[in-house]
Amino acid sequence: LLRDGGEMVCLIKPQFEAGREKVGKKGVVRDKAVHEEVIERIIEFASQNGFFVKNLEYSPIKGPEGNIEYLVYIRKDETGGVDAAVDIKAVVDAAHGELDK
């Protein structure tokens, strides 16, 4: 899929990663805690499977139904890991502060 040192930006769509019980009307996830949980799981999976997580940001564009989505920047690196500057809570808080208006 990606050679060592290769980089990619992946879109995290919480509405598809959260359990059904955590998804609201029209498939929208509004709970910040659910967003944090989904992102933590994805970042943990990536870092344990040969990817280094370089950055995390929220998408400035909401999904068609109003979902907040996130972008994670990763590099193929057998040692894995997460950059110390990646702050899931801060990114989720900023996303909700900016996009939940």
Residue ranges and their predicted role:
Residues 1-3:
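Rossmann-fold NAD(P) dinucleotide-binding segment
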